[in-house]
Amino acid sequence: MEAALQRFLPAPEIAPERLHRAMRYAVLGGGKRVRPLLSFAAGELALADPARVEVVAAAVEMIHAYSLIHDDLPCMDNDVLRRGKPTCHVEFDEATALLAGDALQPLAFQILAEHVLADSPGAQIEMLKILALASGSRGMAGGQAIDLASVGKALSLPELELMHIHKTGALIRAATVLGARCGSGLAPDEFERLERYAKTVGLAFQVVDDVLDCDASTATLGKTAGKDAAQAKPTYVSILGLARARALAEELRAEAHAALSPFGAKAARLRELADFIVLRKF
């Protein structure tokens, strides 16, 4: 995956050099790579060509990296640490960081458009649409808007879930679905099960993030711990308490496994990823 990202990103010596260095700084050398791993695992289940999945995985990771750059800016979460190193706007400057995020988003769609990923033009256009919807106001960006508007407010559990279905879950679902769409090995009912799995692990990822924000150190997380409570953000922990939030993560893991049950051993990697998402310590 790292080699693919290196290949798709602009070389640092190409003008504008500072912008390209910032883009590479934000994308390379860190992160769990959960979204690309989901793309590859779903692609394997759907008998997809790994070369196609690699393109999808890189595009999704670029969208994710752009979102992190913007989330960390002073006008949003105002964070100074990401993946164990200074955030992009700290390492470079705020304007360069903003532009790096702005440039990564269209680059993701550029590489999707430049490669044959599906067996028909219509199917490939649908893949572009899936990533666009997951990234925009009806997906990740919309979830961030809800998040910013919710600071200092008491949300109900359904309201919190709606926020994270958009903010975190949308791109995780897109990563999984796009990996599978690179292949043709799934029947419609199997695809529905995969989508159910993706929605469930997307929520589980956020529940665990909320738990770790309370329960892990900054050194372990590679980002500032305790930020949610300090900023009075509604979280699964603030609504449910730590023990109940942990239990919810386990319930979601069981749901994810259940969605995959008809696939048997073919879905082993997807099960492993559900386990990692819930059991991780960072």
Residues covered by each model-derived region:
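Short cytosolic juxtamembrane segments of multi-pass membrane proteins
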Residues: 281-282
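Mg2+-dependent prenyl diphosphate-binding active-site environment of isoprenoid biosynthetic enzymes
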Residues: 9, 13-257, 268-278
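N-terminal amphipathic/basic leader segments beginning at the initiator methionine
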Residues: 1-10
